[in-house]
């Protein structure tokens, strides 16, 4: 962990902000907010803001710890070589301390300001990503994304629990939806950046099992994801606005996955089907969870 580029201080606020992986944090904040808004019951706006802020800060802390640990790996990958640590714009101690400060502070404030059950789940999600996934799973098994996907699946559960104070079937389903969504989302990316992973010795699925196996698994997870997203509708946890949206969104997801999963040879097309699936998978999750909130609003207003 000591071969990252030499230090080039001072690091400015943009480097610290980059450590939090703001693009990833956007999705984390959004799904956490959707879990909070879709939950039954009411919550004071200040407490709601505190909950979402803590989710965001906790995710940022976990991301900073991830980059602290993986600085050498990031230096060897084209996609990540310009991050603050491998680019030499920040020292590792600063990144580590920043990550621990964000992580610890977010859990403490969540516990005092929102509730300790939400704080415990937040703490576990940070530990899950920064240790279980980053340190233990990612360098050891091609199933790292499958098992490690739980780290990114907690925000809607935390948002829901911030309102209700307990864990019921619905927040568990929201967790499972993101858990099942993660492999096809990330493996689509891994297919077109697999040479980077191979170069630094990370056993991502395309590197270890090959493209053909990865494509089959992308299709399998996408097919399983579709009925899972409909379960909230079937059990009455969400209404028709969400249900029909989930069905249409899921069918498009499967259709794009079929194009990726059934490809036996890859022509010189820049892996466009894989890139389309990856791009759509991000849009899919935003719209799916957005429609969950829209469904809740329609129910409250008596529109369904």
Swiss-Prot record:
<keyword id="KW-1133">Transmembrane helix</keyword>
<feature type="transmembrane region" description="Helical">
    <location>
        <begin position="45"/>
        <end position="65"/>
    </location>
</feature>
<dbReference type="InterPro" id="IPR000537">
    <property type="entry name" value="UbiA_prenyltransferase"/>
</dbReference>
<comment type="similarity">
    <text>Belongs to the UbiA prenyltransferase family. Protoheme IX farnesyltransferase subfamily.</text>
</comment>
<dbReference type="GO" id="GO:0048034">
    <property type="term" value="P:heme O biosynthetic process"/>
</dbReference>
<keyword id="KW-0472">Membrane</keyword>
<feature type="transmembrane region" description="Helical">
    <location>
        <begin position="145"/>
        <end position="165"/>
    </location>
</feature>
<feature type="transmembrane region" description="Helical">
    <location>
        <begin position="107"/>
        <end position="127"/>
    </location>
</feature>
<comment type="pathway">
    <text>Porphyrin-containing compound metabolism; heme O biosynthesis; heme O from protoheme: step 1/1.</text>
</comment>
<keyword id="KW-0997">Cell inner membrane</keyword>
<dbReference type="Pfam" id="PF01040">
    <property type="entry name" value="UbiA"/>
</dbReference>
<dbReference type="GO" id="GO:0005886">
    <property type="term" value="C:plasma membrane"/>
</dbReference>
<dbReference type="InterPro" id="IPR044878">
    <property type="entry name" value="UbiA_sf"/>
</dbReference>
<keyword id="KW-1003">Cell membrane</keyword>
<dbReference type="InterPro" id="IPR030470">
    <property type="entry name" value="UbiA_prenylTrfase_CS"/>
</dbReference>
<keyword id="KW-0812">Transmembrane</keyword>
<keyword id="KW-0350">Heme biosynthesis</keyword>
<protein>
    <recommendedName>
        <fullName>Protoheme IX farnesyltransferase</fullName>
        <ecNumber>2.5.1.141</ecNumber>
    </recommendedName>
</protein>
<comment type="function">
    <text>Converts heme B (protoheme IX) to heme O by substitution of the vinyl group on carbon 2 of heme B porphyrin ring with a hydroxyethyl farnesyl side group.</text>
</comment>
<feature type="transmembrane region" description="Helical">
    <location>
        <begin position="277"/>
        <end position="297"/>
    </location>
</feature>
<dbReference type="InterPro" id="IPR006369">
    <property type="entry name" value="Protohaem_IX_farnesylTrfase"/>
</dbReference>
<feature type="transmembrane region" description="Helical">
    <location>
        <begin position="24"/>
        <end position="44"/>
    </location>
</feature>
<keyword id="KW-0808">Transferase</keyword>
<feature type="transmembrane region" description="Helical">
    <location>
        <begin position="234"/>
        <end position="254"/>
    </location>
</feature>
<dbReference type="GO" id="GO:0008495">
    <property type="term" value="F:protoheme IX farnesyltransferase activity"/>
</dbReference>
<feature type="transmembrane region" description="Helical">
    <location>
        <begin position="172"/>
        <end position="192"/>
    </location>
</feature>
């Amino acid at each position: 962990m000591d071969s990252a580029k030499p230090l080039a201080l001072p690091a400015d606020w943009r480097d610290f902000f980059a450590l939090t992986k703001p693009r990833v944090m956007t999705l984390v904040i959004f799904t956490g907010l959707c879990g909070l808004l879709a939950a039954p019951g009411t919550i004071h706006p200040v407490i709601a803001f505190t909950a979402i802020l803590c989710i965001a800060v906790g995710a940022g802390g976990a991301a900073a710890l991830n980059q602290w640990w993986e600085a050498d790996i990031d230096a060897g990958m084209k996609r990540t070589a310009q991050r603050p640590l491998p680019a030499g714009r920040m020292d590792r101690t600063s990144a580590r301390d920043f990550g621990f400060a964000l992580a610890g502070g977010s859990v403490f404030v969540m516990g005092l300001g929102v509730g300790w059950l939400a704080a415990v789940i937040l703490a576990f999600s940070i530990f899950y990503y920064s240790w279980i996934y980053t340190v233990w799973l990612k360098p050891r098994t091609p199933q790292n994304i499958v098992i490690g996907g739980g780290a990114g699946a907690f925000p809607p559960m935390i948002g829901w629990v911030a309102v209700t104070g307990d864990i019921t079937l619905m927040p568990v389903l929201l967790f499972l939806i993101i858990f099942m969504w993660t492999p096809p989302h990330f493996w689509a990316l891994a297919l077109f950046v697999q040479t980077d992973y191979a170069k630094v010795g990370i056993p991502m699925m395309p590197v270890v099992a090959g493209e053909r196996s990865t494509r089959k698994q992308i299709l399998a997870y996408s097919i399983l994801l579709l009925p899972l997203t409909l379960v909230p509708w079937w059990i009455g946890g969400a209404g028709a606005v969400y249900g029909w949206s989930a069905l249409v969104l899921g069918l498009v997801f499967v259709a794009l996955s079929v194009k990726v999963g059934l490809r036996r040879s890859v022509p010189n097309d820049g892996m466009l089907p894989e890139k389309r699936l990856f791009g759509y998978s991000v849009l899919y999750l935003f719209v799916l969870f957005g429609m969950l909130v829209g469904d809740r609003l329609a129910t409250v207003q008596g529109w369904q």
